[in-house]
Amino acid sequence: MILVANFLKKSLLFFLFFLGACSSNNEVVSISGETFGTFYDIKFEKSQYNIKIINDEINNIFISINQCCSTYKSDSLVSFKRDSKNTDLFKEEVKYYFQEVVKISEKANKTVEGFILFDDYDYFNAVAKGYAVDIISTKFKELNIEDFFINIGGEIRVEGMKNNNFWKIGIENPLPNQLGIFKPFEIKQSLSIATSGNYRNPGHIVGIEGSKIDQNVLSISVMDKKSTAYADALATGLFALGKVDLIKNNIRDNGIPALFIYKGDEKIQSFESKQWKELLQ
């Protein structure tokens, strides 16, 4: 499989909108900003910890991942490694992150036929947003924050609920001339959701063996109970298959919790797997 470098430059392709939060009876804190060339939006029930402390923890995670693993920063450890023969200076944190990326891609490869293996340091950015979501989620649990919503550039982790109200999110209509929510839904359990698409940045994902993505393929969202990075990898791998029938068959045959939006008969259509529907029940 041959893919251009832009395969990895996953900007915000597909919005997952936050539509609702915990009950208004409980104060929900919102922290937002920019990171990794995109936005982040984090909401959580007010905890025993000072909000500034939590905000600092989040920023430290972003700084650490950027300084360690960004393939776009010339002074990052990964960039230094690529330009240097002195592997002794390659810190353990980079090795650990690389090993995690390889594990994620190997797992996705077993699910999606033809999925590219992230087996080189240039692939760090492939699941960086999903990985950062998972790290922040883990940190929140360490801080005993149980109800939260984390969204980094469309890669999302949702946990908890309050007073019988679930977190609500919506998927944006993938057609650029049709603004609005395509499909809203409630999240009734702890879930990660990631989406891949080409409509905001045409051609940035190249199909297997360098082929072009069918213009009828609009977007794919994947859910996973544990890992946002894994959902991120699966969504990208499925989208890169490039053909409507091939994507549908992979989702169906492998039991992937996915929502596939595509053009058919001159109108937008969607395919929801049985596993996707079950996770939303």
Residue positions per predicted region:
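Mature catalytic core of soluble alpha/beta enzymes
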Residues: I2-F14, A21-Q281
